[in-house]
């Protein structure tokens, strides 16, 4: 077994016993990127010098033995490139920010450092987190490690692909409409979206502020619990951060689901779901049933409106958030502008990619005078109805379970010229963001052509513990834990 296949708890034991060093781990991470990332292109920037220097400092602390070690001690990590990191380039995979080096850490970046993790690299993504395939990266698209003819998903495609390739012990992504869970499903890894407000967004470059949430991508559920433990909690720098207690997530991993009540929305298990995906999810339900859980079919009647409501709301918020990228304060600055208005126009035209421009235009239109009530206001009303759908189910059930995605990963270029088709791939994930709930994607099978299938488990607000408990119990008995592409080391 490769070092990078071991659980975080096993690695900590090896580090404390001085069987390996943090420097060994970081060097192995960097070597993996150099040797294998040329084809999957999950990594944008490697901070080799800074990561090795940090590793040596951590090794020295262990030798001295007079300091308590952090929860993520010594673990090499990769962060999605929209998480601000001091002195490590942060571009959001956009040419607009191609040379942007932040002068401070975001809260989550600081928390993983405070937990003694080593940030090795920043990871590929769809530009400004807008996309579901990583084909919208302003630099180059990432590929799926299971088959590079296929997309890794998005927008956190680099985070999921890098995890499947075992470049790191964990990665971090952001999830606005499924951007952690969908690529996790496509790449056969675990992706957790916490409750909105559970993890600080300070230092996350905003796409849609009422939807964005940071979360971990890992190779197993236990590791996700470790990482969430380190990054969760109230933050005075984020006004939307929830001031609620953070439980011990590791204590929730009991393996017990006896008496658990599972609701399965008929709208997300029937028509429009690939038969192979449906069969894998039904097999997962049968597995949980054999462990003492019960399940029933339920209804989320407003699901069909979730995708249009999501794209109206997220694009409206994006058009506001991205107004700050104007060529004046930072980023691309056009050279050929005759006046200030021309500077704004030319800088944004040169710096933003096609999908970002499309969503800015859609959002600006939805917010414009005469259309606000017809589009934005109506989308907010649909959001309320979707929240009510979830509340109705959770009155009788502990979790909701359904596919993470309607199909397995699609081929590179397959949907690139059809944005509506691309948007509809989000049907299983966007309702969770609209309601602000926690959800996890765990591997539950493979298609006939060898591509991973993801199972999504949704919980009540701030009940990540139950979500993790169910996911962990299933993972331990399902037989898919530890599977990785054949070429990956170990």
From Swiss-Prot:
Heterotrimer of A, B and C subunits. The keyword Ligase applies. Keywords: ATP-binding, Ligase, Nucleotide-binding, Protein biosynthesis. GO terms for cellular component: glutamyl-tRNA(Gln) amidotransferase complex. Belongs to the amidase family. GatA subfamily. One of its GO terms (molecular function) is ATP binding. PANTHER family: GLUTAMYL-TRNA(GLN) AMIDOTRANSFERASE SUBUNIT A, TRANSAMIDASE. SUPFAM superfamilies: Amidase signature (AS) enzymes. This is Glutamyl-tRNA(Gln) amidotransferase subunit A. The keyword Membrane does not apply. Its EC number is 6.3.5.7. InterPro entries: Amidase, Amidase_CS, Amidase_dom, AS_sf, GatA. Allows the formation of correctly charged Gln-tRNA(Gln) through the transamidation of misacylated Glu-tRNA(Gln) in organisms which lack glutaminyl-tRNA synthetase. The reaction takes place in the presence of glutamine and ATP through an activated gamma-phospho-Glu-tRNA(Gln). It comes from Brevibacillus brevis (strain 47 / JCM 6285 / NBRC 100599). The active site is at 80 (charge relay system), 155 (charge relay system), 179 (acyl-ester intermediate). It catalyses: L-glutamyl-tRNA(Gln) + L-glutamine + ATP + H2O = L-glutaminyl-tRNA(Gln) + L-glutamate + ADP + phosphate + H(+). It holds the Pfam family Amidase. It is an enzyme of class 6 (ligase). GO terms for biological process: translation.
């Amino acid at each position: 077994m490769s070092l990078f296949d071991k659980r975080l708890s096993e690695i900590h034991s090896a580090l404390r016993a001085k069987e390996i060093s943090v420097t060994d781990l970081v060097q192995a991470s960097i070597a993996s990127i150099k040797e294998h990332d040329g084809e999957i292109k999950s990594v944008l920037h490697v901070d080799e010098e800074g990561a090795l220097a940090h590793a040596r400092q951590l090794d020295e602390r262990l030798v001295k033995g007079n300091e308590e070690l952090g929860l993520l001690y010594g673990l090499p990590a990769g962060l999605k490139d929209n998480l601000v990191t001091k002195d490590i380039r942060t571009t959001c995979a956009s040419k607009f920010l191609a040379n942007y080096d932040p002068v401070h850490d975001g809260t989550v970046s600081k928390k993983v450092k405070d937990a003694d993790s080593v940030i090795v690299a920043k990871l590929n993504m769809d530009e400004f987190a807008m996309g579901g395939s990583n084909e919208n990266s302003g630099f180059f698209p990432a590929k799926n490690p299971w088959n590079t003819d296929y997309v890794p998903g998005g927008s956190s495609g680099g985070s999921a692909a890098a995890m499947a390739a075992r470049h790191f012990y964990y990665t971090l992504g952001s999830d606005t409409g499924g951007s952690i869970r969908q690529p996790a499903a496509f790449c056969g890894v675990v992706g957790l979206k916490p409750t909105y407000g559970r993890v600080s967004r300070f230092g996350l470059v905003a796409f849609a502020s009422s939807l964005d949430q940071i979360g971990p991508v890992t190779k197993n559920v236990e590791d996700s619990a470790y990482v969430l433990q380190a990054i969760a909690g109230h933050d005075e720098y984020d006004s939307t951060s929830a001031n609620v207690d953070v439980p011990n997530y590791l204590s929730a991993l009991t393996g017990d689901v006896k008496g658990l009540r599972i609701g399965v929305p008929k709208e997300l298990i029937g028509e429009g779901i690939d038969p192979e995906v449906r069969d894998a999810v039904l097999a997962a339900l049968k597995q949980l049933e054999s462990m003492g859980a019960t399940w029933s079919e339920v209804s989320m009647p407003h699901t069909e409106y979730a995708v249009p409501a999501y794209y109206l709301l997220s694009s409206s918020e994006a058009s506001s958030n991205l107004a700050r990228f104007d060529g004046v304060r930072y980023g691309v600055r056009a050279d050929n502008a005759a006046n200030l208005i021309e500077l704004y126009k030319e800088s944004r035209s040169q710096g933003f990619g096609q999908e970002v421009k499309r969503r800015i235009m859609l959002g600006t239109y939805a917010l414009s005078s005469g259309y606000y009530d017809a589009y934005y206001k109506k989308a907010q009303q649909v959001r309320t109805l979707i929240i009510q759908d979830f509340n109705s189910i959770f009155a009788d059930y502990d979790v909701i379970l359904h596919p993470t995605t309607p199909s397995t990963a699609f081929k590179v270029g397959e949907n690139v010229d059809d944005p509506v088709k691309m948007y509809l791939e989000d049907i299983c994930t966007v309702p969770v963001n609209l309601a602000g709930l926690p959800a996890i994607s765990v591997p539950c099978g493979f298609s006939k052509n060898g591509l991973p299938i993801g199972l999504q488990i949704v919980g009540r607000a701030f009940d990540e513990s139950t979500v993790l408990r169910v996911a962990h119990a299933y993972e331990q008995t399902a037989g898919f834990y530890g599977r990785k592409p054949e070429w990956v080391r170990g």
